[in-house]
Amino acid sequence: MAELLNVKPTRMELLNLKRRIQLAKKGHKLLKDKQDALVMEFFTIYDEALQLRRELNLKMKEAFEALQMAEIDVGTLRLKEISLSVKPNREVEIRKRNVMAVPVPLIEAESFKRNAGERGYAFVSSSAKVDLVAEKFEEVLDLAVRLAEVEETLKRLAREIEVTKRRVNALEYIIIPRMEATVKFIKQRLDEMERENFFRLKRVKALIEARGGS
């Protein structure tokens, strides 16, 4: 049996508890609907994250293969010198947006892809294979930024799902059962008190009638 609330067994408390139960059940339904919607949104974004992860792994494989070919073409030392002369790429700005009322990051950044002239290294000291390396790693950066946003969104949604689940369970298995058990107890206690009063009044009436007849 659920633990009872510490309240007086009065009709006022009974009415108050019934109202609280109605509100708790409405709150439970709203939270359950929110939980279900969050879970659906989570798995939608999870599918996107899996796809982005697969694409990123493929792009990284292509980028490192291109890097190996460039090292063979111009040499490791020269490739390092070229990499040090590359101009910084785009800046990334992190804002916030809401997904199912959950604040999640929104990474605002232009594509990292640039043409060879924007990268800053001299054409005469470079090669087509070096350009390909830069191109491939810029593609990696684009995907990595998008994946970071999606994975952080998943983490925050997962936390919100867990918090909502705990609230749903608390209402469903603790709070509402305690109030319902207390309502049942108060009803039983009020019935007992009513019967006691009835028999008390009956005895008083019998005594009065007995005295009146003597």
Swiss-Prot record:
UniProt-annotated location(s): Cell membrane
Membrane topology, record value: Peripheral membrane protein
UniProt cross-references to InterPro entries, sorted A to Z: V_ATPase_D
Signal peptide: none
Key words, A-Z: ATP synthesis, Cell membrane, Hydrogen ion transport, Ion transport, Membrane, Transport
Molecular function GO labels: ATP binding; proton-transporting ATP synthase activity, rotational mechanism; proton-transporting ATPase activity, rotational mechanism
Alphabetical list of Gene3D superfamilies matching this protein: 1.10.287.3240
TM ranges: none
GO cellular component, one term: plasma membrane
GO biological process, one term: proton motive force-driven plasma membrane ATP synthesis
Pfam short name (any one): ATP-synt_D
NCBIfam families linked: PRK00373.1-4, V_ATPase_subD
Function, as annotated: Component of the A-type ATP synthase that produces ATP from ADP in the presence of a proton gradient across the membrane.
Similarity section: Belongs to the V-ATPase D subunit family.
Assembly behavior: Has multiple subunits with at least A(3), B(3), C, D, E, F, H, I and proteolipid K(x).
Listed name of the protein: A-type ATP synthase subunit D
Species annotation: Desulfurococcus sp. (strain SY)
